[in-house]
């Protein structure tokens, strides 16, 4: 994402574009958590898509939800197992309740910078406790064995310069997914959209599994450690949940870790 931000400095009329990295060592997730690529094999997708804020056809509070619904079908088409794909509010993609893709959206002047990380060939180990704690991860190759058969790992591993061109040439699944995502976002920006459509599309894929809130970065600290059940979205994109322990409903307006 930082590389993409550097590219748009001093370029006021730059159109939609994307940057793909072969690996990342300064990656970040929500709430400042780190998001690093594996040191063994460069087989996952790390990309950034940049476009003008003025081109977004829905309120900005709904943009994370819409971006998630655009990326989800690109991943869904690559699942050949009987596994189920869900969206976790506000913009994570899950397969069988395990995280396969994360999305981070930042605003830079009048540009929207969308960072996307998708586990294609391998699922990184995620801490279960501490500041870097997160959901168990999965990868596309676990749900589509053909993905591994279409990768020339020898060329990737011997590419000491880590040139993205070589990575994409030897990794058709990676390139195909990146192209699909960019095309989906581009088509969306060129067409009309409505808040009701965003909410409907997200709720159709939203996970309704009972989960436990584990982050301490909450406005309502009484929710820490509580078991919750996602219920519905408000018009502004915030999430209404039921607190199981207290049998009450409340609204979440910021990302939480569960």
What spans do the regions from the language model cover?
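Residue-level signal for inorganic ion chemistry
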Residues: 47, 71, 92, 117, ...
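Short, acidic (Asp/Glu-rich) active-site segment that either coordinates a divalent metal cofactor
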Residues: 110-154
């Amino acid at each position: 994402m930082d590389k993409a931000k550097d590219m748009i400095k001093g370029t006021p009329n730059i159109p939609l574009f994307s940057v793909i990295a072969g690996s990342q060592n300064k990656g970040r997730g929500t709430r400042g958590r780190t998001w690093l690529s594996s040191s063994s094999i460069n087989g996952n997708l790390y990309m950034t898509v940049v476009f003008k804020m003025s081109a977004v056809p829905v309120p900005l509070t709904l943009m994370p939800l819409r971006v998630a619904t655009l990326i989800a079908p690109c991943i869904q088409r690559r699942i050949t197992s009987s596994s189920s794909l869900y969206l976790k509010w506000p913009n994570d993609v899950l397969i069988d309740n395990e995280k396969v893709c994360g999305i981070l959206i930042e605003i830079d002047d009048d540009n929207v910078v969308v960072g996307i990380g998708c586990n294609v060939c391998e699922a990184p180990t995620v801490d279960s406790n501490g500041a870097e704690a997160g959901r168990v991860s999965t990868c596309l190759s676990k749900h589509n064995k053909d993905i591994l058969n279409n990768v020339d790992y020898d060329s990737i591993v011997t590419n000491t310069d880590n040139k993205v061109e070589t990575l994409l040439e030897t990794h058709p699944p990676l390139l195909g997914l990146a192209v699909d995502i960019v095309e989906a976002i581009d088509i969306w920006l060129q067409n009309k959209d409505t808040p009701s459509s965003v909410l409907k599309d997200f709720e159709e894929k939203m996970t309704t599994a009972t989960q436990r809130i584990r982050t301490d970065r909450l406005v309502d600290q009484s929710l820490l450690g509580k078991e919750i059940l996602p219920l519905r979205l408000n018009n502004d994109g915030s999430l209404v949940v039921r607190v199981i322990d207290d049998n009450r409903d409340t609204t979440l307006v910021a990302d939480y870790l569960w």
